[in-house]
Amino acid sequence: MKNLFLFCRAGFEKECAAEIQQRAGELNVGGFVKANNNDAYVVYQCFEDDAADTLVKQLPLDSLIFARQMFAASDLLVDLPENDRISPIVAALSDVSKAGEVRVETPDTNEAKELSAFCRKFTVPLRQHLKKSGSLLAQENPKRPIIHVCFIGPGRAYVGYSYSNNSSPHFMGIPRLKMAADAPSRSSLKLDEAFGQFVPKEEQEERIRSGMNAVDLGACPGGWTYQLVRRGMFVSAVDNGPMDEKLMETGQVKHYREDGFRFEPQRKNIYWLVCDMVEKPARVAELIEAWAINGWFKEAIFNLKLPMKSRYKEVTAILETMQTILKENGVTDFKVQCKHLYHDRDEVTVHLWLRPNTAWN
């Protein structure tokens, strides 16, 4: 297969396209991008047959900012007959052997999601035929490749596969999170999703645990503080605005009515620093850099608001500058990740982990 199909948020196709063009080039996989505004997906067509397999194997999905999910894909299947859509799809997947799962998906647009009921019904007979052809195992296996069938319209679909060790576990790359009734704001879901994105399940008990100390800069009214409190942490909430009363009643939150850019923690045993402030992204990055250089936290999650234009260029420039400044100031052991989360809008979420291979005291 010579295409790489990438899911993204509608309206961010240009950013996703610019990113995959650059990252594929770094792996010497030549090709060109096919993308339309508000389609919520991008297709990177490789010049060489089977080159998409190189990308789904060697390009970590977690290293891509704007892609939610990706898979090696066939050319677009068009005019699938209503009386037999299955046969052309099974034929297009003839080179896929013993996959462990099949997902029938759509891009994340209102128009495409009108097909979601059809996709659910279609999955059952398709699964049976794929098992008969040998493309799909009789029993689901999370360690085997995943077959993707993405309908972009009636009778039009891209089909292909991803590898389970380099693929989102979520349908369409979208985690299904529920808004808690007592959460102070919808922004709470951003941090909830970020923890799932940046901290593997098997490490969450160690890295996101009860009793930890955390700081929330720009905390009002407490959407992000809520997620920290829910996990049993003690939080210094920094904001000139008011905090949610129920959060304050937990006894786990101390409210500092201060400017987050001027706040200095009294205690230096902080594990988590979180920050979601409506501010210029470069200024927020500088704030996090200062905290990192001072060694005031172990892990940080923060949002960077995106400009209207050149969003990919701006984000990558800020992240590169951050890494340079940290290294120039003696902070050399760290890991940075960045993702345009499902619950993000015109922003991206960044995770900075200091001394990732050194245990927290």
From Swiss-Prot:
Keyword set includes Lipid biosynthesis: no
Stored InterPro entries: RlmM_FDX, RlmM_THUMP-like, RNA_MeTrfase_FtsJ_dom, rRNA_MeTrfase_M, SAM-dependent_MTases_sf
Quaternary structure note: Monomer.
GO cellular component: cytoplasm
Catalytic activities: cytidine(2498) in 23S rRNA + S-adenosyl-L-methionine = 2'-O-methylcytidine(2498) in 23S rRNA + S-adenosyl-L-homocysteine + H(+)
Summary of the function given for this chain in its UniProt record: Catalyzes the 2'-O-methylation at nucleotide C2498 in 23S rRNA.
Keyword entries, A-Z: Cytoplasm, Methyltransferase, rRNA processing, S-adenosyl-L-methionine, Transferase
GO annotation (BP), single: rRNA processing
Catalytic center residues: K305 (proton acceptor)
Binding site for S-adenosyl-L-methionine: S187, C220, P221, G222, G223, D239, D259, D276
Gene (name only): rlmM
This enzyme's EC code(s): 2.1.1.186
Location relative to the cell: Cytoplasm
GO MF annotation list: S-adenosylmethionine-dependent methyltransferase activity
Name of this chain's protein: Ribosomal RNA large subunit methyltransferase M
Protein's organism: Shewanella sp. (strain W3-18-1)
SUPFAM superfamilies in alphabetical order: S-adenosyl-L-methionine-dependent methyltransferases
